[in-house]
Amino acid sequence: MSQHTFVAGTAPGAVPVVGHAWQMMRRPLHFMSSLSAHGDLVKIRIGPTSAYVPCHPELLRQVLTNDRVFDKGGVFYDRARDIAGNGLVTCPYRDHRRQRRLMQSAFQRTQLERYSTAMRAEIDATAARWHDGTVIDAFPELYGMALRTVARTLYSTPVTEELAQRVEQAFDTVLNGLFRQMFLPHSLRRLPTPANLRYRNNLRFLHDTVQDLITEYRRDDTQRDDLLSALLASRDEDGGRLGDTEIHDQVITVMAAGTETVAGTLTWIFHLLSRHPEIEARLYEEIDTVLDGKPPHWDDLPSLSLTDRIITEALRMYPPAWIFTRLTASDVDLAGVRLPEGTTIVFSPSSVQRHSEAYDDASRFDPDRWLPDRTSAVARQAFTAFGTGARKCIGDLFARTEATLALATMLSQWRVTVEPDADVRPVALATVYHPRRLRLRLTARTPGQ
């Protein structure tokens, strides 16, 4: 792929003043996926600012693996910092190495095994509330389950149901509002409109709540096997540690990333399985064979190989984030185009992960393309659902573990059928996108049914 002769182009349809921002707000996924028809590196306009979109997997690899030059910045990260501050996902290059070293121990496999116990407890509690014949609205239900699961993993001390519901509502309001905030001019974001006030008030509540939890943990030196305790205890090789503000930002980051990623991926998986009953039947068979009617545990995960490939393929076709941005920290050449310092790069893993040069029949749902004897280096390189290079998501295994436990738990107890009123046109949120409407009917089952 590195021998490819790249073509640079310009996207048509820019409107005076707003550029292509109106298209990104109306049909963001369609707009981003349409750009490859105009070149491998495509120039767009967001308001008065020009930006460049790498549409070819090799160009995106160059951007993601050179984080010194292609630094975190641009419209997405400017607004994401409202929520996550200077956390690991949003921090610039100068802060990233130190933060990554300090957080690494909290995401080691030994820690993940401990977290999996908390994950299972919340997933089991959610499944226990369902009844034979229950119909659930997939994304909201799975979003709530994922948020409660991440919260229990972070913070093992019980909280009131009222606080848990308030946090869930606040996150939903903020993450939905962030999409709108990304494309509003600064002057409009400052206006005291009902939407802006809801966004600010809920954002303030989230920050205050997280700070209260950190303060409580600082006062109480009880040993806990949760993620917040691991962050508080982490040290680098020089004995340095994360400060309270840094821990605050990391907690918000983990909650936001871990919730939307898992909920969106699981929702798309149920849609895909409904369209491919032969793969669905194989999945039920694997879960029944491996678990034999028992709840899934950490030690079962390596044996759930088809489950893992289904998650990977869903992440390829519907990656958890539809848009990211970077900002060039110095002048650089990309696809033969000279980009001056301060140039905005915009990219969508969704469009790149369906590129024909990386995947045969890229629009087809084929989990077995990830079998060791079928996958290629090019395909692995083009898979950027969790990023790549030094800034690859530190929580990729965390999210995969949560998704695998949730999927195996649900399908070991329930036969899941998509209701006929499904509308799978994608709805974009701040980072993820999900079907407009996907309701699931749950029918109780036992292994072999």
UniProtKB/Swiss-Prot annotation:
pH dependence comment: Optimum pH is 8.0.
On whether Heme is a keyword of this UniProt record, the answer is yes
Query: What Gene3D superfamilies is this protein classified in?
Result: Cytochrome P450
Residues crossing the lipid bilayer are 251-273
Q: In which pathway does it act?
A: Antibiotic biosynthesis; neopentalenolactone biosynthesis
Keywords tagged on the record: Antibiotic biosynthesis, Heme, Iron, Membrane, Metal-binding, Monooxygenase, Oxidoreductase, Transmembrane, Transmembrane helix
Question: Cell inner membrane: is it a keyword of this entry?
Answer: no
Quote the cellular component terms of the Gene Ontology held in the record: membrane
Q: How does it sit in the membrane?
A: Single-pass membrane protein
Report the EC number(s), separated by commas if there are several: 1.14.15.32
**Biological-process GO terms, alphabetical:** antibiotic biosynthetic process
**Which reaction is the catalytic activity of this chain?**
pentalenene + 4 reduced [2Fe-2S]-[ferredoxin] + 2 O2 + 4 H(+) = pentalen-13-al + 4 oxidized [2Fe-2S]-[ferredoxin] + 3 H2O
* UniProt-listed PROSITE patterns: CYTOCHROME_P450 (PS00086)
Q: What is its main location?
A: membrane
Indicate the family of this protein: Belongs to the cytochrome P450 family.
Q: What is this protein called?
A: Pentalenene oxygenase
